[in-house]
């Protein structure tokens, strides 16, 4: 760059700093690039698939899927992990459906959890913004986007047609929230529901879409698609769900990773079950018939007994986890038409 241009740039930067404050514009090389802080999800498999060890702080995350697929369970486990690290958590329950007893079973300290059950979508998002701006909340969950009902809809008649109202509300809120989220380094998780698109579909295109318009798809740094794919049985009794979690969008690491984990009723994501499955995949745990072995030790006949052994022997589980963090590679998920929808990269 010639001298005249350098002087002009220095003058412009000086004027910008004077008007907008120091650090308004900076050279990338002047600042040390620090790794993104992450909050673990409670699922070792998912933490590895996300590439940064969990969900990123200072970013927006969207978790969506069909009903009873484990969306709220996953967010409550992330809250529990955040509280274990000494963080403060807030839960905006727009669905008015949070069960504190279930949350406590998942490890959430419900006495310290900040809870809001707002009347309107505007109130929910305003409370979220105020909590984020306080800079003292580490993780904030909004459950769910579909339940953020605009004030005009609540005050109107049952049959009133108000097209695009919720989408406009989300778009406006996210424009306002994003900068504050980054500055306060808060992880904000939006839980979302699925709806079916009405009308003619292109071949190969998914008929499913999320509620609240396209704004959240653009602003989210991570999008997770969570689905129940089977039942876990103990004899004839169903004790949980087999769940597939797909990283549909990831701005911080390669996306399209996929994991299959277990969510047990009343317990949440089975850490021990994950260690066994991952250990078998990574050839650290040997499976011969119904028996599972780790090193020289037989750890159980059948998965349920092996799970119990790891639960009773935390040092063995910790050793296996440390080895798996180095070796385990999550599966690549098949890309679908709808996966790129709303991505800006």
Curated annotation (Swiss-Prot):
Entry's InterPro entries? AAA+_ATPase, DNA_recomb/repair_RecA, DNA_recomb/repair_RecA_CS, P-loop_NTPase, RecA-like_C, RecA-like_N, RecA_ATP-bd, RecA_C_sf
User: Any one cellular component term from GO for this entry?
Assistant: cytosol
Q: Which CDD domains match?
A: RecA (cd00983)
Subcellular location field? Cytoplasm
Residue sites binding ATP per the record:
65-72
This protein's record includes keyword Nucleotide-binding: yes
Give the residue ranges for region: Disordered. 326-345
Q: Which domain of life is it from?
A: Bacteria
Pfam families attached here? RecA, RecA_C
Q: Does the keyword Nucleotide-binding apply?
A: yes
Q: Recorded GO terms, molecular function?
A: ATP binding; ATP hydrolysis activity; ATP-dependent DNA damage sensor activity; damaged DNA binding; single-stranded DNA binding
Q: Give me the stretches of Basic and acidic residues compositional bias.
A: 326-336
- A Gene Ontology biological process term: SOS response
Key words of the record: ATP-binding, Cytoplasm, DNA damage, DNA recombination, DNA repair, DNA-binding, Nucleotide-binding, SOS response
Which family is this sequence assigned to?
Answer: Belongs to the RecA family.
Provide the function of this protein: Can catalyze the hydrolysis of ATP in the presence of single-stranded DNA, the ATP-dependent uptake of single-stranded DNA by duplex DNA, and the ATP-dependent hybridization of homologous single-stranded DNAs. It interacts with LexA causing its activation and leading to its autocatalytic cleavage.
Its recorded name reads: Protein RecA
Record the organism: Stenotrophomonas maltophilia (strain K279a)
Q: What is the lineage of its organism?
A: Bacteria, Pseudomonadati, Pseudomonadota, Gammaproteobacteria, Lysobacterales
The gene name on file is recA
């Amino acid at each position: 760059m010639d001298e005249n241009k350098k002087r002009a740039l220095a003058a412009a930067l000086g004027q910008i700093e004077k008007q907008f404050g120091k650090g308004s514009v900076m050279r990338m090389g002047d600042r040390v690039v620090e790794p993104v802080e992450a909050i673990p999800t409670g699922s070792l498999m998912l933490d590895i698939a996300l590439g940064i060890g969990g969900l990123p702080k200072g970013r927006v995350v969207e978790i969506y899927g069909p009903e009873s697929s484990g969306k709220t369970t996953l967010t409550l486990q992330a809250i529990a992990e955040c509280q274990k690290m000494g963080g403060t958590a807030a839960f905006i329950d727009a669905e008015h459906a949070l069960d504190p007893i279930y949350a406590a079973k998942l490890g959430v300290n419900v006495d310290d959890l900040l809870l809001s059950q707002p009347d309107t979508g505007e109130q929910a998002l305003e409370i979220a913004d105020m909590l984020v701006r306080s800079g003292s909340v580490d993780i904030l969950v909004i459950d769910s986007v579909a339940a953020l009902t605009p004030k005009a809809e609540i005050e109107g008649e049952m049959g009133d047609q108000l097209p695009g109202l919720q989408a406009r509300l989300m778009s406006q809120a996210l424009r306002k929230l994003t900068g504050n989220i980054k500055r306060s380094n808060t992880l904000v998780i939006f839980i979302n529901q699925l709806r079916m698109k009405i009308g003619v579909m292109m071949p190969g295109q998914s008929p499913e879409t999320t509620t609240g318009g396209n704004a959240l798809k653009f602003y989210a740094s991570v999008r997770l698609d969570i689905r129940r794919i089977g039942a876990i049985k103990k004899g004839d009794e169903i004790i949980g769900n087999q769940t597939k979690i797909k990283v549909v969008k990831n701005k911080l690491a390669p996306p399209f990773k996929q994991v299959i984990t277990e969510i047990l009723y009343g317990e949440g994501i089975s850490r021990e079950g994950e260690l066994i499955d991952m250990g078998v995949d990574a050839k650290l745990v040997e499976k011969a018939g119904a028996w599972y072995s780790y090193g020289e030790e037989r750890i159980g006949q059948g998965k349920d007994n092996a799970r119990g052994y790891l639960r009773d022997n935390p040092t063995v589980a910790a050793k296996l986890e440390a080895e798996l963090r180095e070796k385990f590679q999550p599966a690549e998920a098949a890309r679908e038409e709808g996966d790129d929808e709303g991505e800006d990269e």
